[in-house]
């Protein structure tokens, strides 16, 4: 019986992993579709689409699915229309979160996001309820192993970006710029250093809260994980980071 139980657990775990992978593919396809609809179908002329395709390839989304998503978005194929919506809310202990969604039913998504917040010790707020705690900037991220920091820094100075910094913990180089300059800066870095790991508009906290309490870390992790598990939620940003106790 023990062997049977173990096999069942393995099957259950694989089923859960397959479901997560399928959900991730769905979200990637949705982002490709929206990016292609909003701009040109050529990724070299549509940076958002280029970034979406790059992210999809990293996750091994099949090429035919990428091509079909672009074709459906730019052709006369009847399909669902998605809109970008941003939700703001508080997590446990007054933490602040901004939730980014692509949805074809804003009432459904709002209801589900509100339910997750309340179930996990937080509450969904009105527009503007937490965004004042953040700066809205352009964000460009490169892996540290692939690009020399000094070269990035020098290029950033030339382009008059807000900041270029090293994130040693994550092994990343992070560039931020003014919203109005984002397109120009993103394209200039792409031309010199290739496709970044991430390039999008982002809400960066004015004051980052460092959290070391294990119970609070667990609560916030559970909240963010459940939000990002929602089919309509693309990603979540917050004003906190987890640190180890000394």
Curated annotation (Swiss-Prot):
GO terms for molecular function: DNA binding. It comes from Wolbachia sp. subsp. Drosophila simulans (strain wRi). InterPro entries: Integrase-like_N (IPR017856), TACO1_YebC-like_2nd/3rd_dom (IPR048300), TACO1_YebC_N (IPR049083), Transcrip_reg_TACO1-like (IPR002876), Transcrip_reg_TACO1-like_dom3 (IPR026564), YebC-like (IPR029072). It is found in: Cytoplasm. One of its GO terms (cellular component) is cytoplasm. Residues 1-22 are annotated as: Disordered. This is Probable transcriptional regulatory protein WRi_002620. Belongs to the TACO1 family. It holds the Pfam family TACO1_YebC_N. PANTHER family: PTHR12532:SF11, TRANSLATIONAL ACTIVATOR OF CYTOCHROME C OXIDASE 1. GO terms for biological process: regulation of DNA-templated transcription. Keywords: Cytoplasm, DNA-binding, Transcription, Transcription regulation.
């Amino acid at each position: 019986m023990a062997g049977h139980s173990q096999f069942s657990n393995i099957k259950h775990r694989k089923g859960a992993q397959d479901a997560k992978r399928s959900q991730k593919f769905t979200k990637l396809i949705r982002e490709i579709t929206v990016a292609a609809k909003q701009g040109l179908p050529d990724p070299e002329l549509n940076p958002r689409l280029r970034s979406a395709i790059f992210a999809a390839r990293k996750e091994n989304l099949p090429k035919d699915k990428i091509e079909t998503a672009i074709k459906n978005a730019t052709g006369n194929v009847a399909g669902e229309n998605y809109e970008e919506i941003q939700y703001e809310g508080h997590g446990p202990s007054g933490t602040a979160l901004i939730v980014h969604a692509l949805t074809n039913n804003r009432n459904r998504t709002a209801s589900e996001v509100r339910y997750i917040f309340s179930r996990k010790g937080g509450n969904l707020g009105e527009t503007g309820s937490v965004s004042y705690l953040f700066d809205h900037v352009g964000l460009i991220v490169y892996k540290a192993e692939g690009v020399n920091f000094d070269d990035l820094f020098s290029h950033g100075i030339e382009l008059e970006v807000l900041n270029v910094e090293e994130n040693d913990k994550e092994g990343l180089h992070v560039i931020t710029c003014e919203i109005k300059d984002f397109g120009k800066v993103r394209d200039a870095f792409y031309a010199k250093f290739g496709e970044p790991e991430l390039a999008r508009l982002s809400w960066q906290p004015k004051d980052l809260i460092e959290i070391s309490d294990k119970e609070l870390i667990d609560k916030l992790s559970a909240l963010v994980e459940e939000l990002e598990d929602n089919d309509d939620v693309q990603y979540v940003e917050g004003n906190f980071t987890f640190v180890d106790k000394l």
